[in-house]
Amino acid sequence: FDFIGKQKKKKVITISHITAKNMYKSLEERINKFPQGAPPSDTLYKILNVLYTEQEAKLVAQLPIKPFRVKTAAKIWSVSESEAYRVLDKLASKALILDIEDNKGKKYIMPPPMAGFFEFAMMRTRHDIDQKLLAELYYQYMNVEEDFIKDLFYSTETKLGRVYVQEEVLTNDNEVSILDYERATHIIDESTHIGISMCYCRHRMQHVGKACDAPMDICMTFDNVANSLINNKFARRVDKIECKELLHQAYEHNLVQCGENVRKGVTFICNCCGCCCEAMVAAKRFGNLHPVQTTSFIPNINHENCVKCGKCITACPIDAISKVKEDGKEYIKIDEDRCLGCGVCVRNCHKNSIMLLKRDEKIITPANSVHRAVLMAIEKGQLQNLIFDNNALASHRAMGAILSAILKLEPAKKILASKQLKSVYLDKLLSMNDK
């Protein structure tokens, strides 16, 4: 039988000789070739079982890491291009892969678990999967077990996400020092497609009876990712004006903007609460080990004006502010090692006793998603998976982008890259680039 179970005379994709467990194991191994992986566990197996049929697990496990065309999938699966297209279209309709249009037609890419297909599954109400069961499994995997969250947020120096400061609280001095890519409004202005979806985090918590009352339809995606999700009904298309109105709504609800940790080509901005969203929960759970990259700002309290009302303490989404007593005096203290620099506390101080200052340390942001992926892969010892993808012929453009990112690395990272790849070709490239 083929992908959807219909018998055909022509060559089709069969699964009778492989057990379901092996299929999901192969899929798990494929997922973990990418820096943003998912540590094995019985819970992960159950999650994959909800999201993928056995046939889908087998097929997706064979797909390359880099973007690919339908002819690549057809060759891997040994089927016709029309059959491969039908399968890929079905996978895209479930947001298990993304379909992206360019000047050569349609290409496909398998997103990582997060930010990726884990979230997509809960970004709209669905009846084709058991979302309550899935939410319970997610809660077990991310909130009870620790391996996934530690791997996602703490296994690399380079972070997957970064925080955007609340622009409405910036002073004139702040406005001078903030860069365009540090502004959520700039990301919105530069986007060609904008999609709005249900907040995966709060939707998940809703199914386990732990959701807060923060806005639900406020998750933002951009450009090719947004267009794919819109076309497959996982997001609704909005214009820049409406997106900025939603951003303002997020500010008013003390939500923290967490987006992709890149300067160009940001694909998502989540509006995170402190009770439901993984990054904020992790920030509270693991102390000063930042799960996402901070902003370049840090709040500073003017203690002469502060009335110690505690509104900033209540508003802080990661419990980085507290009331302390020293030498018989009580005052408000910000834990700067924990603080993300989001600006929520500034917004909630009606006495104007808190203002944002520039951090002393320089915040380094990867240029784009390829640069970030290369850095994360080097730090996890997985760079070879990005370069040598045995499941398909490498795309020259993707290879060129990866090598270009490597050539721009600092010397220490270049050495790590060279050691991991053990490539004479890469060594030659690096030596030529350093001259």
Residue ranges and their predicted role:
Residues 77-93:
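Short amphipathic alpha-helical interaction segments
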Residues 108, 258-264, 268, 286-315, ...:
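Ferredoxin-like iron-sulfur electron-transfer modules
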Residues 95, 254, 310, 319, ...:
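Glycine-centered, phosphate/nucleic-acid-interacting loop/turn motifs that mediate DNA/RNA or nucleotide
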